[in-house]
Amino acid sequence: MKHLDYSAPGEREAGERTWEVVRAAFEERLPSPRKRDWRPFALAAAAAVVLAAAFSPPGNAVFGSLRDAVRGERNAKPALASLPAPGRLLAESSAGIWVVQNDGSKRLLTGYRDAAWSPHGLYVAAVHGNELRALEPNGRVHWSLGRTGRLRNPRWSFDGFRVAYFAGRSLRVVNGDGTGDRLLTRDVRPGPVAWQPNAHTLAYVNRAGDIEISNVDKRNRNATVQTRAAPGQLDWASDGKTFIAVEPHAVEVFSQRGPRIGGLDRGIAQMSAAAISPNGKRIAFVETRGGRSTLQLTGVLGGPTGPIFAGAGTFANIGWSPDGRWLLLDWRSADQWLFIHSPVKKVLAVSNIRANFGADSRIAGWCCP
């Protein structure tokens, strides 16, 4: 079946205006513009039932067959030649973790998984077998720590002096030099964890599905924040005053020890990822509805919400560049990474991600100038 590509007259121009309006509202704190209708246009193709999703700037979504065929961005580069902003990437695959330099050169650290950058990108915390290791981006190991149970999701504190990680069904903390390993709690759901900036305070999800805020050095300074559904992701604003929790159908915004102070409920749409911008003002999030995913932008403390990019299939995860001017979107179904620039709309697409990084590769972090 031939795949048809439709766009309504003037639609891309209207999309560009929306991008500028949303961006300006956050950067200049202008009043919210009149809400526009961005629902895709349904068009009939001869001899077949074909849905063509409308352009949502700066990309497009094409539903050209009953199988929701996915076509990525045109003019995509066949490989990642360089990053569009200062910094380095971490990507994970079943073969190990990839360290991608600013010039596009990359190194595979075989056998590692669950990787995270340290502050300033000097080290990587990662799991190798039954060991938690701290290593340089060139693979040189500085320390290792063996533990029973499945190790996962290590995360550095803001100053690099603490590393939190899961071992089996417990949450543990070790000093940044590999000493002083200790149990923090067993009342935890292994998965999301996030350090508050400028503090040794950790946010995690307890067995009941609520969020615990715990100072790992002063154990009597704890708080419990109730949620509507167990979050799958936590992220702090850079000033440490607010954090977000990504629930199955919502993004909730909380003050540093509760309560809820904002957020978005997206109804039946599935929320798959969200990230706060480096300046702490904006939230980029991905929602999926009816086989179509949309990257959207909103304010941490309210303001307009607008689409940035939409496409058929799955957007796996997102990340901000260290300078906050680019968003990296993993368009899993199209086998592409998209670097999306703000405030001037621009998309740089890279194809063949599975061939270059592995069939199950994912973005783990974009760190440090």
Question: Where are the regions a protein language model picked out?
Answer:
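Hydrophobic "lid"/C-terminal helical patch
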Residues: 22
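Sequence signature of WD/YWTD-type beta-propeller architectures
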Residues: 3-5, 13-19, 27-30, 36-45, ...
